[in-house]
Amino acid sequence: MTTKRSLFVRLVPCRCLRGEEETVTTLDYSHCSLEQVPKEIFTFEKTLEELYLDANQIEELPKQLFNCQSLHKLSLPDNDLTTLPASIANLINLRELDVSKNGIQEFPENIKNCKVLTIVEASVNPISKLPDGFSQLLNLTQLYLNDAFLEFLPANFGRLTKLQILELRENQLKMLPKTMNRLTQLERLDLGSNEFTEVPEVLEQLSGLREFWMDGNRLTFIPGFIGSLRQLTYLDVSKNNIEMVEEGISTCENLQDFLLSSNSLQQLPETIGSLKNVTTLKIDENQLMYLPDSIGGLRSIEELDCSFNEIEALPSSIGQLTNMRTFAADHNYLQQLPPEIGNWKNITVLFLHCNKLETLPEEMGDMQKLKVINLSDNRLKNLPFSFTKLQQLTAMWLSDNQSKPLIPLQKETDTETQKMVLTNYMFPQQPRTEDVMFISDNESFNPALWEEQRKQRAQVAFECDEDKDEREAPPREGNLKRYPTPYPDELKNMVKTVQTIVHRLKDEETNEESGRDLKQHEDQQVVNKDKCVKTSESTTTKSKLDEREKYMNSVQKMSEPEAETNGGNLPVTASMKLSGNLKHIVNHDDVFEESEELSSDEEMKMAEMRPPLIESSINQPKVVALSNNKKDDAKDADSLSDEVTHNSNQNNSNCSSPSRMSDSVSLNTDSSQDTSLCSPVKQTPVDSNSKVRQEDENFNSLLQNGVNLNNSPEEKFKINDKKDFKLPEYDLNIEEQLVLIEKDIDSKATSDDSRQLDHINMNINKLVTNNIFQPEVMERSKMQDIVLGTGFLSIHPKNEAEHIENGAKFPNLESINKVNGLCEDTAPSPGRVEPQKASSSADVGISKSTEDLSPQRSGPTGAVVKSHSITNMETGGLKIYDILGDDGPQPPSAAVKIASAVDGKNIVRSKSATLLYDQPLQVFTAASSSSELLSGTKAVFKFDSNHNPEEPDIIRAATVSGPQSTPHLYGPPQYNVQYSGSATVKDTLWHPKQNPQIDPVSFPPQRLPRSESAENHSYAKHSANMNFSNHNNVRANTGYHLQQRLAPARHGEMWAISPNDRLVPAVTRTTIQRQSSVSSTASVNLGDPTRRTEGDYLSYRELHSMGRTPVMSGSQRPLSARAYSIDGPNTSRPQSARPSINEIPERTMSVSDFNYSRTSPSKRPNTRVGSEHSLLDPPGKSKVPHDWREQVLRHIEAKKLEKHPQTSSPGECCQDDRFMSEEQNHPSGALSHRGLPDSLMKMPLSNGQMGQPLRPQAHYSQTHHPPQASVARHPSREQLIDYLMLKVAHQPPYTHPHCSPRQGHELAKQEIRVRVEKDPELGFSISGGVGGRGNPFRPDDDGIFVTRVQPEGPASKLLQPGDKIIQANGYSFINIEHGQAVSLLKTFHNAVDLIIVREVSS
């Protein structure tokens, strides 16, 4: 107990000389893991003046402690105190009291007896009100009550006239008592993140106020009386709804930092130029159309951020701001810059990303101190020759996909102006289709998210020493230092990250659904894959490297329109753009089909493709560190994609503005990285992966555009891959084929076609084996593969070789998948490639997507493939297709790769989650939880070459730690998860006699059975990816949930398991396990936990995504009063200070999972959770009040048991008593939106689209869980708990593949008439139709189905995903072509009367 005690004594001579005892005045027992106050303290009670008991686990204070009447300072932050004893009144000499980060609900009334108390720190406690006696602490000078539950302050609060610092951030305050006008000595007032709708009038009297925070409220205007605060130097009113700033503000003559970011300003007051001392003005993310001429009066300004507005021109007076050092105007509509801008002699950082600039003024050559300039995504034709004078310029970004910060410039004479200019291969820049917002009725995406993604994609990542801090750190609050509140910013950031991840996960979920369909086909292809595996094993690395190189080239080319000259490159360019939008596209391919048939198709594609990958990367970066073995390679692929995702997250958080630059860079990098990771990196050895990641990370820091980052990491990956692979050409060919396939699929795919595609995808993956497929079918399958990740399978060099043999150019597909950053290449042909890929990183990718897809995906796969809308593919890939033809050059292949990769990325994420959801792929429920996996025996179904389950094998989970074992048990089968490196393994897995009836889950188990460690790794890797990245979690399928649960445990446990064991269990595991393995798999693949390169991400991502629970597993203490609930400040918080991550069993990164973990301590304490947590266990274990956590757990557990009596079916052999996740077992009906809270349903996808509410689709819903429902906003804890319960209740036990998600509920068809008003569009997306790519809900149905509904759109309350449209405005939609249905819906004016058929659970 006293080991860490430090005794500080007054400076006195040595007691040996004095012959007397020294006087102990200070004791420090901080961080000693104490559960009670040490008794030895009381021996010094007469002399003790300062006592530090910080960061222990003390639950109550002994009475003796309050006999220490000499005590001046009592420090008890970060403990488990629930009450403050009334006897504290005995400490009459107490001056400083710190009880922050506990579970204290109220102060005792008699605290008023502590007359000399001057500093009280009580932040992060569930304090709902202050006692009246509190206002009698007349000597109080500093009061910190951040992050509590205060709704009001005592009426006589104004008695505290000596207050100098008052922090009340993150409460629920709506007003201040009028008596506060007496607080004339108040210098700092923080009212941020409360519920104020107007600035309290009492502020006008606080004449001494210097720093004022009121960000994150609901203000609509800034009153002029703020101008009376003449001493005010810092004013933060960002993140409100401010539409007007009154002119009286101009009298704040000492104002230095003025933050107006993220409001609704349309103009600034003309008097703003009177603020002569302002050094920082942030007006980004508003609706400004111009800056007033008076802005030139801000003579002292050094930083001006007006990014994300609608400014078309800058006033010439801006040239008067001669002290300007950082200027950001990203994402505006600037067509030219005033020549006066050359007067900025001190400018060092200039951000002009994403505008409409065609020329730059010569005067910019006078900016002698300019170090970083971002000119990407404009319409520049050249650069002024005066740029040669910029001697200090260290980074210049000219395009979205630039691989290096500086590129050689050549002198040329401009034909129009006859002036000497600088140009290079990147000019002329052309605007990206991304600028066009989607105008499709069928689109269902979140504009805000979309905008956020745009920001992310468009960021330049420069590592400029001078401005690095500005960009990477949150916006500076001047030089002000806030009191070091114990409330950890990391937690808030984590919450934000989780939100982002959740959004992405949802996007991924959608994508994964598509991927699943493909996966089913992939299962079929698995056998062929096995044949190709050996080849791919040897060649995959090289091929992947080649692919990466190609991808990089394509990316670079993509950035410039000139890329079009290269057949391959042009598509790549489109793909890159798509990669930005790809996430959306993959997930919303159908939506895009209709909506994107428009010009925005390409954009959407890119966006869709990119975000999902990025999302995956975010959570999966940990996986980056993979072993050098092929197994590791497979992991690498996943980890790479994870890494990409991670980067994308950063990008999302940071946009153009300097403060956001670094993040945005990551985003861009992510998309490219994802691609590279998926394909080349996966195949590359762990070392190369780590290097690549490091490079990526470096690039991220260096290139804030993120464009560069993407390319360079990918290039490196690709280079490595090339080294590994010898079939770069094949990759290209594959890409070409993929493009073709995409076309075919888009134009021809019917539900049958979709199935065919799925089969074809499998065949294609097996290219060598099935060369016979019709070209159309092959093309389609390629498309699907790409979307699903089959392409990734193809990507493996061996596979490529095989593909070449078949005569299909699937190597290109492979490349494409790689481009996506998913190892979808592998996944698409799980059956065929599994064995082959087992040894290569590609395998991992395949297993992920394949797993998801393979479960009976063949039927619905078409639908998933359909998700790839032709339009989208065409935008990015069709050109490539034309260019590529069958023998397109490698660059075209790269382009195709990108497009398909993008799709694939999306698919990969969606694959496991969505596909599983889609199909009754109910992976074995047993896999649902790690504990289940651990304890339960699972029946592994072996599949023959045709992917038919041969006979269930009952496999007892390995005795590995719960989490790990669980993975071993079958979760939803991870089709590609455990591809073994050798064909023999494959044989083991597949038995000739397989029952097609066996659950899709069963099929995956077959794949899973592959014993190859490489396969295992791939499986794990995918899991890890899923877990790490939200997109993985987005998967609603049970497998997904299982993985989620298992992942944390697995993460830790997998390390311990031998590679072989892992493989076998991995096989047993289903997609879920694989997902859960993601974190663990990453480690598993590495073979050692230390390996996780993603460690960086781990801390964050793991916490939230896969390791989230695990990371915080130890911490039972609430981190904050609100337990950092995802909810906004208003959401209710748990009673306990903070839930432990450990409590959150859903290690899954699924959207809902994130929500749970955020809000509810844990659904139930699972052994798996424990182990998982232990894996990620961070030091900061905190205990939530036992009551709260246990109640929640019991509540959830009980609900689960109530609602999900396990109904095991043959397919459920793997099923444990617990379901991996509530999500896992949702019956399709149960998953319908109506069961979920709106917030969940509306969760934005990472893509930037709103995650469609849970799909009510009969088949889908089962796999599709609320997690898919977007949690655009963090739901309140109660909501989360309910949501979890809902999920649990709806999780249907796994059943045979034939059993539809209906297993839980009988579905009745109901015909409904609805009227949708266009505003401005219909707000939903469709798929299917006689030429469509299939219907994700009913692959065998050629009807038109609703696939997405825009959460806030006109159809949000009328339609649900899965609704079949029978008639629209009198036009029959039966046996109608997809394109015709889209065009009809688009041509209808105003309103559309629809007759739909909805399946309702009876």
Curated annotation (Swiss-Prot):
TM region(s), chain numbering: none
Coiled-coil intervals: none
One term under GO cellular component: postsynapse
Comp. bias regions, Low complexity: 647-659
Biased composition (Polar residues): 660-689, 1070-1084, 1128-1139, 1149-1164
Phosphoserine: modified positions: 440, 444, 595, 599-600, 617, 712, 849, 854, 869, 928, 1150, 1171, 1276
Domain PDZ: 1311-1400
Modified residues annotated as Phosphotyrosine in this record: 483, 917, 970, 1097
The LRR repeat ranges on this chain: 23-44, 47-68, 70-91, 93-114, 116-137, 139-161, 162-183, 185-206, 208-229, 231-252, 254-275, 277-298, 300-321, 323-344, 346-367, 369-391, 392-413
Location in or out of the cell: Cell junction, Hemidesmosome; Nucleus membrane; Basolateral cell membrane
Sequence segments annotated as region (Disordered): 465-489, 507-543, 629-694, 824-864, 990-1018, 1070-1093, 1107-1187, 1198-1217, 1222-1274
SMART domains the UniProt entry points to: LRR_BAC, LRR_SD22, LRR_TYP, PDZ
GO biological process, one term: cellular response to tumor necrosis factor
Sorted UniProt keywords: Cell junction, Cell membrane, Leucine-rich repeat, Membrane, Nucleus, Phosphoprotein, Repeat
Positions of post-translational Phosphothreonine modification: 485, 914
Bias (Basic and acidic residues): 470-480, 507-534, 629-638
UniProt xrefs under InterPro entries: Leu-rich_rpt, Leu-rich_rpt_typical-subtyp, LRR_dom_sf, LRR_R13L4/SHOC2-like, PDZ, PDZ_sf, Synaptic_Scaffolding_LAP-MAGUK
Top-level lineage group: Eukaryota
Pfam families, sorted: LRR_14, LRR_8, PDZ
GO molecular function list: signaling receptor binding
Purpose: Acts as an adapter for the receptor ERBB2, in epithelia. By binding the unphosphorylated ERBB2 'Tyr-1248' receptor, it may contribute to stabilize this unphosphorylated state. Inhibits NOD2-dependent NF-kappa-B signaling and pro-inflammatory cytokine secretion.
Complexes and interactors: Interacts with ERBB2, BPAG1 and ITGB4. May favor the localization of ERBB2, by restricting its presence to the basolateral membrane of epithelial cells. Also found to interact with ARVCF and delta catenin. Interacts (via C-terminus) with DST (via N-terminus). Interacts with NOD2 (via CARD domain).
Protein family membership: Belongs to the LAP (LRR and PDZ) protein family.
Protein name per UniProt: Erbin
